[in-house]
């Protein structure tokens, strides 16, 4: 920024207009003259000329509130009000006894006494002048200038204490300390304050979280969120569901945890909890190696498996409340018919009812399991249409493709109902072992976060 320094006194000005007006004080040039015939005053700026013209107006609109005096100009009234202030700070001259309210007026008065005694140095700016007339004109220029902000004084004193302030407004604002009036109530607590700025400071310091909540609810910070740089905003792309039994082909598999990665490659261990979508931006940053072995089931048994009374249940799987993608627990949720003989199955394929209305498919059964035969009229296509059947030679989730039932075990009610229907003649067979029937992978999942696993009912093993 360009500045304009004065070569005579060293003052610096920011604008050319102020620099030109200042030069008039050194050259004693007054280009703006009063047009009144009886007044020959001239001024260095148009503003000061217009302010002077108000003195020639017969209307005096500025009246003192303490006396009946009126003034043409507001600054004259302001100077007059200083005479009614009992706490004003007065600077008295020792030679003539005059008193001044400001330090600048007092120094200007002392410069006049110094000029009359032969000292031609300005008492305001310490400038040496050539003659007394030049010094007096120079002092008049200081009289027309406004006092700098550094010389502003606290000339307004409180009536109840010794504190002084710059303006009357500051004194009135200070009076709440003595009156005890607290009209500003905090909206978050019951605390009151005498000044508004004290309430604002208390709210920002103590209730910053409440203010943040109100800003979020009103939507004031929405523009702040959108103004964040794009590289700091994580964008999560929606993920398409993985096909059942097929490995993931994108780069997201490396960023998934070990448990999720193993469930993605092993459909027999799918859990009911959906995999949350991770940001694509974080995929290459956290590679996770695939597990070398499948997760081991929980071993926190409630009962001792080596006990004599518990030994028939040692090979049975623990019951898990699982809801898969293909409703693999359909066999457990179906109601059962009334039981008949557990060792005899009629051609109508009526099965015995088990326990509390649910059939638990065992993982391993004893060696004396009974193979069941299926009549040629049985059509299993409505049931098997729910799943994508693997090839007959593949292994299912239980390690064997045959489903065998021990003595007393029963098949679901859905199979007994489907035995009365026949829709596709290609599935008809004379006699068929149910163990040769390929079954879909049935998940074997243990819910995480529980201290003890849910055990099967005891009467499943003793029927």
UniProtKB/Swiss-Prot annotation:
Main location: nucleus
Localization: Nucleus
Entry's Gene Ontology cellular component terms: Golgi apparatus; nuclear body; nucleoplasm
Keywords: Activator, DNA-binding, Metal-binding, Nucleus, Repeat, Transcription, Transcription regulation, Zinc, Zinc-finger
GO terms, biological process: negative regulation of transcription by RNA polymerase II; regulation of cytokine production; regulation of immune system process
Keyword Transcription regulation: yes
Pro residues bias: start-end ranges: 287-297
Family note: Belongs to the krueppel C2H2-type zinc-finger protein family.
General function of this protein: Acts as a transcriptional activator. Involved in the transcriptional regulation of type 1 receptor for pituitary adenylate cyclase-activating polypeptide.
Official protein name in the record: Zinc finger protein PLAGL1
Organism: Sus scrofa
């Amino acid at each position: 920024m360009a500045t304009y320094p004065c070569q005579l006194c060293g003052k610096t000005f920011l604008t050319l207009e102020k620099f030109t007006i200042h030069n008039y004080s050194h050259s004693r040039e007054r280009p703006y003259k009063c047009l009144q015939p009886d007044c020959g005053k001239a001024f260095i700026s148009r503003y000061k000329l217009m302010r002077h013209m108000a003195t020639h107006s017969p209307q005096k609109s500025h009246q003192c509130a303490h006396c009946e005096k009126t003034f043409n100009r507001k600054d004259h009234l302001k100077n007059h009000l200083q005479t009614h202030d009992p706490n004003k700070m007065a600077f008295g001259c020792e030679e003539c006894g005059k008193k001044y309210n400001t330090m600048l007026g007092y120094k200007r008065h002392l410069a006049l006494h110094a000029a009359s005694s032969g000292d031609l140095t300005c008492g305001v700016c310490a400038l040496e002048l050539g003659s007394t007339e030049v010094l007096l004109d120079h002092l008049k220029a200081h009289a027309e200038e406004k006092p700098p902000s550094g010389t502003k004084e606290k000339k307004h004193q409180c009536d109840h204490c010794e504190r002084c302030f710059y303006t009357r407004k500051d004194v009135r604002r200070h009076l709440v300390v003595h009156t005890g009036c607290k009209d500003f109530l905090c909206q978050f607590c019951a605390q009151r304050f005498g000044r508004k700025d004290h309430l604002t400071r208390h709210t920002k310091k103590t209730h910053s979280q409440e203010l943040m909540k109100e800003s979020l609810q009103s939507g004031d910070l929405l523009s702040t969120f959108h103004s964040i740089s794009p590289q700091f905003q994580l964008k999560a792309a929606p993920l398409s569901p993985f096909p059942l039994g097929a490995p993931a082909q994108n780069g997201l598999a490396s960023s998934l945890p070990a448990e999720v990665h193993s469930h993605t490659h092993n459909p027999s261990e799918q859990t009911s909890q959906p995999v949350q979508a991770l940001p694509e931006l974080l995929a290459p940053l956290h590679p996770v190696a695939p597990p070398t072995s499948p997760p081991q089931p929980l071993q926190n048994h409630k009962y001792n498996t080596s006990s004599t009374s518990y030994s028939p249940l040692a090979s049975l799987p623990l019951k898990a409340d699982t809801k898969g993608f293909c409703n693999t627990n359909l066999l457990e949720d179906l109601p059962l018919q009334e039981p008949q003989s557990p060792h005899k199955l009629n051609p109508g394929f009526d099965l015995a009812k088990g326990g509390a209305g649910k059939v638990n498919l065992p993982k391993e059964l004893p060696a004396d399991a009974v193979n069941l035969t299926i009549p040629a009229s049985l059509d299993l296509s409505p049931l098997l249409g729910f799943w994508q059947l693997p090839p007959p030679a593949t292994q299912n989730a239980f390690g064997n493709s045959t489903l065998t039932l021990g003595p007393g075990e029963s098949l679901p009610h859905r199979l007994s109902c489907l035995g009365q229907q026949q829709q596709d003649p290609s599935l008809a067979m004379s006699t068929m072992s149910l163990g040769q029937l390929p079954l879909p992978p049935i998940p074997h999942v243990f819910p995480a976060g529980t201290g003890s696993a849910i055990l099967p009912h005891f009467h499943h093993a003793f029927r």
